[in-house]
Amino acid sequence: MSRLVEDFFAFLHVERGMSSHTLDAYRRDIGALIAWGGQQAVGEVVALDRAQLQAFVSAEHRRGLSAKSLQRRLSACRGFYTWLVKRGHIAVNPAAGLRAPKALRKLPRILDADEAVSFVQIPTDTPLGLRDRALLELFYSSGLRLSELCGLRWDGLDLDAGLVSVLGKGSRQRVVPVGSYALSALREWCASSGGGAQQPVFPGRYGGPISARAVQVRIKQLAQRQGMAKHVHPHMLRHSFASHLLESSGDLRGVQELLGHADITTTQIYTHLDFQYLSKVYDAAHPRARRKAR
């Protein structure tokens, strides 16, 4: 990759505080543009014009890339060219105004309240059981992102006040309440593990923070062990937290703050889940819900 591309990634990491996960996605997206440019012999990516970028998007679409992936790929390219304009390397952003096909937004799958409670209540008669119980309870209690949970240290938890402090997307810090069941599980796990303030709450095999992949695999194993029909994954617990909280409170802004969403439109998807639930209740209970008018 060119020096300018590497400088752009350094800018995203240092000045924008972009996580390594998002940065890797940007690298793949910009890398795809560079690879396409090499195949088409169109020259350096910094010199591409609007028509060439549109041809790139069309080629990716024909290759079978989903609308969501195309939108993300175009967003990365748009950000790169915006940065080039601001740094004075090019005069016009060739990606400005380009649009990818709209993605159909799927509603997130969730556990209902009974399923969620049943899932997190695993036996705690072993050290691994204590860890897993604390991990699941905290996930469902506070709606953390997977990356936030993996990176959590003991000094980010205030067990007396019942609060957890995490560094979310864009290096935005937020403080989220921790429920009583999660606090109890965390206290037991703390007493068993003996972790210091600077130590990860959930250490991996070699003492560092547990990996996202390890959590994904463990949650899948626990769900299968309980005979759950649904494919349970870490983000499902976050989705369930948000949906159940919104269902009980109706406070969209409050749920937005707890989830750490910068844009409330991201949170609004849970209102559709809530409406979906209410529609099912209505259809099942109302005497005239499914009857045809005479």
UniProtKB/Swiss-Prot annotation:
Residues 1-85 form the Core-binding (CB) domain. GO terms for molecular function: DNA binding; tyrosine-based site-specific recombinase activity. It is found in: Cytoplasm. One of its GO terms (cellular component) is cytoplasm. Keywords: Cell cycle, Cell division, Chromosome partition, Cytoplasm, DNA integration, DNA recombination, DNA-binding. Gene3D superfamilies: 1.10.150.130, Intergrase catalytic core. The active site is at R145, K169, H235, R238, H261, Y270 (o-(3'-phospho-dna)-tyrosine intermediate). One of its GO terms (biological process) is cell division. Residues 106-283 form the Tyr recombinase domain. Disulfide bonds: none annotated. NCBIfam families: PRK00283.1, recomb_XerC. Forms a cyclic heterotetrameric complex composed of two molecules of XerC and two molecules of XerD. Belongs to the 'phage' integrase family. XerC subfamily. Site-specific tyrosine recombinase, which acts by catalyzing the cutting and rejoining of the recombining DNA molecules. The XerC-XerD complex is essential to convert dimers of the bacterial chromosome into monomers to permit their segregation at cell division. It also contributes to the segregational stability of plasmids. This is Tyrosine recombinase XerC.
